[in-house]
C-alpha cells in the first residue's frame, strides 16, 4: 500500500542552528512578526533571536501575549498585530503554545472568518513564510501540520490541520532548551514519548514512521531521566531535541491516538499542561489497548531494554507498561488528585470529556477499536 510522508520544507538542526539560518531568513522578507510568550521573553531567549535579526538588518515586531493554552482570541489579536505592523513573515519561538499559535496566526492573515471555523477541515492556502524555533524538547510542533487552539465559546480544544501549516523553516538548537525548568522538561519530554508511542501504535503507521518512532522512544527513555535530573547536561538536551523532532515527524504522518484524544479535554477544562495530562493518561490508556497488538508493544519494550528480547510478546508488552510507570515516577508526574483536580467535578464532566475526545477523531486511530464507554472507563481508572 502506498503512503505519504511529509516533513518541514527545511530544517536546520544542531549547535548554532540559528546562526546558520541567516540567508534563509533574509530571503523571507524585511520584517518579521515574532510570536512568543512572556516567560520566554523574560528569560532572554527572544532577545537572542532579535539580536540576530538586527545583525541581518531584519526589522521585527514582537507579540508575546501567548499563554500556556492559546485561545482563539489570542490568535485574533495576533493576526491584527501582524497586519497593523506590516510584517512579511512569521517567526514563532517558544514551547508548543507559541509554535501552534504562530501557525494559526500565519494562516489567519490570509483566511476569512474565525480560526474555530476551520476545525475538522484541511487548512489550505498560501500564507506568509513561517519559521518555528522550539525552546522545549517535546511538543514536536516544529515538525507537524497540526495546531491546537482553545475555542473559548465552547470551552474545548480544537485540532487544526493541513499541509499548509508545516513550517517553511524549523530551527532546532538544544541550547534554547538548556534553561527549561524541571517541570517543563518532564511535561514536554513525556509529550514526545507519547507522540512516538502513539504514532507507532497507530492505524496509520508505516515503515518510515515506525523507524522514527522507535528511535525517538529509545532516546527518550535513555535521556529524559538525565535531562530531568541535570538540566545542564548538553548531551541529554541535544538528544531530547532530536527525539522531540523525530516524534513530531511521526505524528505528522501517522497521527496520534486515544491518549491525545483524552488529554485535550482535561487540558481545556482543568487547565492541565498538555504534556502532563498525556503522562497522567499514557499508562492506563496503553494498558487498555495493549492486547490490540502485543507484537508492536513488545518491539517497543525490546528497543528500551535488550533484556526483554527473551520474553514473549505478551510478557515484553507488560514490561513496557512497567517501564512507563518507572519513567513517570522518575519525572514526578502527578496524579489528578495531586494536581488539585476535584474528583466530583471531574466525574461531572466525564461524559463531556469522552464525547469531546471521540469527536476529535484521535481515538479512532488507535490500533484497537475504542468506544466512548471505553474512554469513560479509562477516565475512571485515573482515580483508582
Feature map (PLM): residue ranges:
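Fold-independent oxyanion-binding glycine-rich loops
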Residues: 9, 15-16, 36-38, 66, ...
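Glycine/threonine-rich beta-strand-loop-alpha-helix active-site module
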Residues: 73-175
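Active-site segments that bind and position negatively charged phosphate/pyrophosphate groups
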Residues: 199-326
Amino acid at each position: 500500500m502506498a503512503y505519504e510522508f511529509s516533513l518541514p520544507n527545511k530544517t536546520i538542526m544542531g549547535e548554532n542552528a540559528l546562526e546558520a539560518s541567516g540567508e534563509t531568513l533574509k530571503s523571507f522578507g524585511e520584517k518579521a512578526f515574532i510570536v512568543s510568550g512572556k516567560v520566554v521573553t523574560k528569560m532572554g531567549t527572544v532577545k537572542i533571536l532579535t539580536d540576530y535579526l538586527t545583525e541581518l538588518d531584519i526589522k521585527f515586531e514582537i507579540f508575546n501575549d501567548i499563554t500556556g493554552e492559546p485561545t482563539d482570541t489570542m490568535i485574533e489579536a495576533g493576526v491584527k498585530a501582524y497586519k497593523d505592523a506590516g510584517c512579511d513573515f512569521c517567526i514563532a519561538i517558544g514551547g508548543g503554545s507559541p509554535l501552534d499559535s504562530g501557525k494559526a496566526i500565519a494562516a489567519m492573515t490570509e483566511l476569512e472568518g474565525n480560526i474555530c471555523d476551520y476545525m475538522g477541515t484541511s487548512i489550505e492556502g498560501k500564507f506568509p513564510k513561517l519559521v518555528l524555533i522550539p525552546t522545549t524538547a517535546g511538543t514536536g510542533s516544529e515538525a507537524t501540520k497540526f495546531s491546537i487552539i482553545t475555542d473559548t465559546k465552547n470551552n474545548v480544544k480544537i485540532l487544526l490541520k493541513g499541509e499548509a501549516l508545516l513550517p517553511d523553516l524549523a530551527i532546532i538548537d538544544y541550547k534554547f532548551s538548556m534553561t527549561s525548568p524541571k517541570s517543563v522538561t518532564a511535561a514536554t519530554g513525556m509529550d514526545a514519548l507519547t507522540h512516538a508511542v502513539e504514532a507507532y501504535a497507530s492505524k496509520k503507521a508505516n515503515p518510515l514512521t515506525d523507524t522514527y518512532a522507535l528511535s525517538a522512544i529509545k532516546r527518550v527513555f535513555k535521556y529524559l531521566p538525565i535531562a530531568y535530573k541535570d538540566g545542564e547536561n548538553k548531551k541529554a538536551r541535544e538528544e531530547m531535541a532530536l527525539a522531540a523532532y523525530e516524534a513530531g515527524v511521526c505524528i505528522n504522518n501517522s497521527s496520534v491516538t486515544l491518549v491525545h484524544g483524552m488529554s485535550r479535554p482535561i487540558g481545556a477544562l482543568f487547565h492541565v499542561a498538555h504534556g502532563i495530562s498525556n503522562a497522567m493518561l499514557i499508562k492506563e490508556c496503553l494498558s487498555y489497548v495493549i492486547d490490540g497488538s502485543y507484537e508492536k508493544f513488545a518491539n517497543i519494550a525490546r528497543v528500551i531494554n535488550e533484556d526483554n528480547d527473551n520474553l514473549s510478546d505478551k510478557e515484553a508488552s507488560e514490561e513496557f507498561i512497567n517501564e512507563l510507570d518507572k519513567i513517570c515516577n522518575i519525572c514526578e508526574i502527578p496524579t489528578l488528585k495531586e494536581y488539585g483536580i476535584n474528583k466530583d467535578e471531574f466525574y461531572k464532566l466525564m461524559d463531556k470529556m469522552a464525547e469531546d475526545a471521540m469527536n476529535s477523531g484521535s481515538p479512532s486511530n488507535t490500533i484497537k477499536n475504542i468506544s466512548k464507554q471505553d474512554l469513560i472507563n479509562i477516565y475512571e481508572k485515573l482515580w483508582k
